[in-house]
Amino acid sequence: MTPLYSVILLTLLAGLAMPVGAMIAHYERIKPIWLEAELMHGITAFGGGALLSAIALVLVPEGIEYFSAGAAAILFLTGGFAFMVLDIQLSKSDTSMSQLVAMLSDFIPESLALGAAFALGNINGVLLAALIAMQNVPEGFNAFRELKASSH
């Protein structure tokens, strides 16, 4: 398989993981109720673990190569602050667009990081694509449940 087709396939799989999570959320009636709650907590924890793994295994080591520790810390905190402000604004607005904006604010940086990893020819692109896919399954799961809950 050519490198271009490999990149297309890996990015497609990472992106399609979100609808897979939504399909899993479609079958949500698990008895007993406590088991359903534990499953939701487990899926959310799995997504958080995948996200932290992507940061620790791929993004931070790549960033350290190009930035000093101080600059990396400032950029990390600035990004965290920007997303906190966005989250506060979205929770205040409480519109139907809030979920879309939240998903896009996650999708765009993921796409940029994945594209940059593959453009640099780094083998970490494959790992990053796998970690993004693992994180997107719980994201799709939770987004489906939130959208369904807000429509009733």
Predicted regions and their residues:
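Intrinsically disordered, metal-sensing/regulatory segments
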Residues: 1-152
